Swiss-Prot record:
One of its GO terms (cellular component) is cytosol. GO terms for molecular function: ATP binding; D-glucose binding; glucokinase activity. The gene is glk. ATP binds at residues 8-13. It holds the Pfam family Glucokinase. Its EC number is 2.7.1.2. This is Glucokinase. Belongs to the bacterial glucokinase family. Coiled coil: none annotated.
Length: 321
């Protein structure tokens, strides 16, 4: 008889829940709920389990915020809860709450060739560290290492490291954003809001007044080639994505590959392919040769957060992935 566990991927707007076959890791019956419609994450879980008429004893839910102890307070939502209390209320024998990029990193060993698009480099080296990052509402970062037949995710808040410009144009962008924001992190340029920041800084540096655009509008105008400033912003976004990925590769020697997740890049995939992304990735001066062979992959799996939550739970329960 198939034994299922609950898995979830929760962001600032939506909560996506599904079932994971504990034997195979297969994800099924995924459903998305608006977080605004429910008073708590526990309430969403109860609705899901009731709708699907299923009883589970284990669960793993990935959330887009730091997880540092029993108390979880979401960054972009009002939900806050005790993991132990939620586990007790739901009657679970085991409940894991993990960072969203912990889940994405744990999905990587489960991905198949059709879930990936490669951008340069050679083949990954088995057993070597892996990096994963992704731009969305913010900039998520994690690393993954293989130790004693177990995958160990190393989450953090790498999206909040300093934005490090490496060209005259990027330096001008930094000065414009510093005057407006104070500290300028990588997330301030590598995210949906970050794309708008790039556009605004480009326009303001030319002494003009920027329009009040949304990230989608910047992307659409860039792809339609109807706005030079938007096209410059999107081009610069791709280059800086490359630089940041190259920095991750240098930091931990990620010869197992660098993986890009998040919902932004797939929206302009052809533009990204033709951009200066890989050039930015390899632009490491004396260490260009070090990163040249490191492959970069775009994850195109529909639900890497759910897949990785299931993988994390299965490994925690004693399975070898």
């Amino acid at each position: 008889m198939t034994k299922f566990a609950l898995v979830g991927d929760v962001g600032g707007t939506n909560a996506r829940l599904a079932l994971c076959d504990l034997a195979s890791g297969e994800i099924s019956r995924a459903k998305t709920y608006s977080g605004l419609d429910y008073p708590s994450l526990e309430a969403v879980v109860r609705v899901y389990l009731e709708e699907h008429q299923v009883t589970v004893n284990e669960g793993c839910i990935a959330i887009a915020c730091p997880i540092t102890g029993d108390w979880v307070a979401m960054t972009n939502h009002t939900w806050a809860f005790s993991i132990a209390e939620m586990k007790r209320n739901l009657g679970f024998a085991h409940l894991e709450i993990i960072n969203d990029f912990t889940a994405v990193s744990m999905a990587i060993p489960m991905l198949k060739a059709e879930h990936l698009i490669q951008f340069g480099g050679s083949a990954p080296v088995a057993g070597k560290p892996i990096a994963v990052y992704g731009a969305g509402t913010g900039l998520g970062v994690a690393h993954l290492v293989h130790v004693d037949k177990r995958w160990v995710s190393l989450p953090g808040e790498g999206g909040h490291v300093d934005f490090a410009p490496n060209s005259e144009e990027e330096g001008i962008i930094l000065e414009e954003l510093r005057a407006e924001l104070g500290h300028v992190s990588a997330e301030r340029v590598l995210s949906g809001p970050g794309l708008v920041n790039l556009y605004r800084a480009i326009v303001k540096s030319d002494g003009r007044l920027p329009e009040n655009l949304q990230p989608r509008e910047v992307t659409e105008r860039a792809l339609a080639d109807s706005c030079t400033d938007c096209r410059r912003a999107l081009s610069l976004f791709c280059v800086i994505m490359g630089r940041f990925g190259g920095n991750l590769a240098l930091t931990l020697g990620t010869f197992g590959g660098v993986y890009i997740a998040g919902g932004i890049v797939p929206r302009f995939l052809e533009f990204f392919k033709a951009s200066g992304f890989r050039g930015g990735f390899e632009d490491k001066g004396r260490f260009k040769a070090y990163v040249q062979d490191i492959p970069v992959y775009l994850i195109v799996h529909e639900n890497p957060g759910l897949l990785g939550s299931g993988a994390h739970l299965r490994q925690t329960l004693g399975q070898v992935l």
